[in-house]
Amino acid sequence: KDFQAQAMEDALGEGTSPVLHGDKLIIVVDHELQSFVVAIDKHTGNEIWKTHRDEVSNWTTPRIYRYDGQDRIVINGSSVCAYDLNTGRFLWKCGGQSLSAIPMPAVGHGLAFAASGWRKDKVHAIRLGQMGDLTDSKSIAWSLDRGAPYVPCPMLWGDELYLLEDSSFFSCVRANDGHR
C-alpha cells in the first residue's frame, strides 16, 4: 500500500509503528496536511476504513485496548484520541498535550495514560468509556506538568506508572492518582 510522500515537519519522515490486531493492520499517518488513521486488511492490503485526524506531525504508535467488550484504539497527539477498532469511528479526544507527540499511551486500571514532553510537559490519565471532547473535564482522572517524556513511552507495571523524561529524570507515580 503506497501512502505517497507526506509533508512531515522537519522532513523527519514517519516514526510510528504499525500495529497488528486480528486481520487489521493499524497505521497512523500524522503530518502537516491531512492526517489520518487507517485499517488495512493484512491478507489483501485493502483499506477497511480510514478516519481523518485533526493533527500535525506526530510520531506515536497507536495502542489497542479492550473496553466494555469492544476493541478500541488510543492515539497520542496534541489531543489524545480514541477510535473504534472495527469501524474507525471517533469516540473521544482530550486536548492539552504538546505538539509532536511520540510516546505510545499506556492503558490499564480503566485509564489511558498519555505523555508528551516537547516544549511543555504533560501527562494525562484519562478515564476510559467516555465520549466526545474530554478536555478540561472530570474525565481527566489526574495530570502532571513535569517529568513527561518526549520520546520514551510511559510504562504501567501493576499499580505504578513509570516515566523516563529525556534528560534522565525518572519518576514513578501511582496509576490511580498520579501521586509520587
Question: For each predicted feature, which ranges?
Answer:
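Repeat-blade elements of multi-bladed beta-propeller folds
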Residues: 13-29, 58-80, 101-123, 148-169
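Conserved loop/turn at the beginning of each blade in beta-propeller domains
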Residues: 10-11, 33, 55, 98, ...
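Structural motif
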Residues: 34-38, 82-84, 120-127, 168-174
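Short loop/turn segments that connect beta-strands within beta-propeller blades
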Residues: 41-44, 84-88, 127-132, 174-177
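Aromatic (tryptophan-biased) beta-strands that constitute blades/sheets of beta-rich domains
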Residues: 1-7, 46-52, 89-94, 130-145, ...
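Glycine- and Gly-Pro-enriched alpha-helical subdomains that act as flexible
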Residues: 164, 171, 178-180
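Asp-box/WD-like beta-propeller blade repeats and closely related beta-sheet repeat scaffolds
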Residues: 1-30, 40, 48-51
